[in-house]
Amino acid sequence: MVKTVDFNGRPFHFIGIGGIGMSGLAYILAKRHLPVSGSDVRSSHITQRLQSVGAKVFNTQEATNLTIFQPTPEDSLTTLIPCASGESKKVEKTHQADSALSPNSLPQIICSTAIADNNSEYQAAKELGYPIFHRSDVLAALIKDYYSIGVAGTHGKTTTSSLIGYMLLGGGLDPTIIVGGEVDAWDGNARLGQGQFLVAEVDESDGSLTKHSPRIGIITNIELDHPDHYQTLDEVVKTFQIFEQQCETLIACIDCKTVRTHFKPQITYSLDPDREADYTVKNVTYKTDGSMAEVWEKGQYLGQMHISLLGQHNISNALAAVAVGRTLGLDFEVIASGIATFIGAKRRFEHKGYSQGITFIDDYAHHPSEVRCTLEAARLRLDQDRYRRVVAIFQPHRYSRTATFMDEFATSFDDADVVIVTDIYSAGEVNIGQISGQQVADAISRHHQQVFYHPSLKSLGSFLSQILEPGDLALFLGAGNLNQIIPELISPKVA
């Protein structure tokens, strides 16, 4: 019987192995020399990276992918096991095969919330009696395997966890790192270290945050998001409160009112010196190469911190890393040196190129608060480098999120000179409420003079070539596939 994730040689098979959350786990397991296989309908540089470390990757999601394991009838389970929804279901013995595979060699099937119950590969795994785990079960087991630092929050998780990982690398601690974005420093979204520390981004989107119990937990902020799972902010708070109870030490940003009201962190940080946080900053300045600030610890001056990122939100993310470093006993000079050399994660205000006098930036922002903060950072960049305009190209992400935050999106683009809205990236959702990008554009236009709606990505490049001018900063916003058109704008096709 397999009730918990097993790291003692039992194979892992990931359905949807190319996803950003799944691939990081698969990479770590493969680098630990465990048998790893998986499937994804799209081949990508992510799946190619997994193949380079020994993972077997199928480019379809079919029942036949599982024939590589060839179980016997005795290998089937009749017990309660976690399924993709995080619940348990009884799996009956249904498969007959001729093989010598022992119960101890049954593959562990790993799914994410994105895998539907009618997925043929998932259905086959159930019928075969294979133990099925949610990806969060694997991460939770890894967290217990290390001295773990879990970074949670509605916004800033990837940058904060990457900063912490980079800081520990700079301090010679050789951490294992799993984040929700790609970082050039470790050529992807995960790295296997030989040290005792694991830095992990822990996700609240589907409620699985409650499975994690790191030694040090961080909460960057809390807002209502993921309306496909949460109906109210209170529901989000309850999820984070369970996480708080499971952390040995909680570090949290008390600039967030929800955190101040509902949580009791042992260590606090804030951008406001008047909040009397354990860690704060003073005399923040912004330059073309990033941000500078004085860092203070419990009223004592620690030193100057420089980060190559713009925006108050990134100062806050860096301050979280400082708090973690000091909690682990690192000298501030080591912390500051590590933070100073971090250049950011991919799709987090990522500089994609420069063409015909136009700078192209890609950012993952898809929540109103993220859009607002990213545009504030763009405005800072414009003021420092004397760009002419900030042109925001926005692809709304998910019908449920767009409908829930329509009014908030309407007022999130104040720092843009021009706004272009595309159609909504569904992320697999059904458009029950008949929400459209046109509605988003109309809402923004009630507060903004220059708003355009251009639904199709196929012709968006041509449209932008007419809108963009030398001196513009073109900022692509969204968690979907909007950034795929950037290369054609940087390297226009010759007619």
UniProtKB/Swiss-Prot annotation:
Q: Which reaction does it catalyse?
A: UDP-N-acetyl-alpha-D-muramate + L-alanine + ATP = UDP-N-acetyl-alpha-D-muramoyl-L-alanine + ADP + phosphate + H(+)
Binding residues for ATP: 153-159
Gene3D superfamilies the record matches: Mur ligase, C-terminal domain, Mur-like, catalytic domain, NAD(P)-binding Rossmann-like Domain
Pathway terms, separated by semicolons? Cell wall biogenesis; peptidoglycan biosynthesis
Q: Which SUPFAM superfamilies does the record associate with it? A: MurCD N-terminal domain (SSF51984), MurD-like peptide ligases, catalytic domain (SSF53623), MurD-like peptide ligases, peptide-binding domain (SSF53244)
Q: List the GO cellular component terms.
A: cytoplasm
Q: GO terms for molecular function, please?
A: ATP binding; UDP-N-acetylmuramate-L-alanine ligase activity
Its EC number(s): 6.3.2.8
Any Gene Ontology biological process: cell wall organization
Write the record's keywords in alphabetical order, separated by commas.
ATP-binding, Cell cycle, Cell division, Cell shape, Cell wall biogenesis/degradation, Cytoplasm, Ligase, Nucleotide-binding, Peptidoglycan synthesis
Query: Where does it localize?
Result: Cytoplasm
Xref: Pfam families: Mur_ligase, Mur_ligase_C, Mur_ligase_M
**Assigned protein family:** Belongs to the MurCDEF family.
* Function of the molecule: Cell wall formation.
State the name under which the record lists this protein: UDP-N-acetylmuramate--L-alanine ligase
Q: Which organism is it from?
A: Gloeothece citriformis (strain PCC 7424)
The organism that produces this protein has a lineage beginning with: Bacteria, Bacillati, Cyanobacteriota, Cyanophyceae, Oscillatoriophycideae
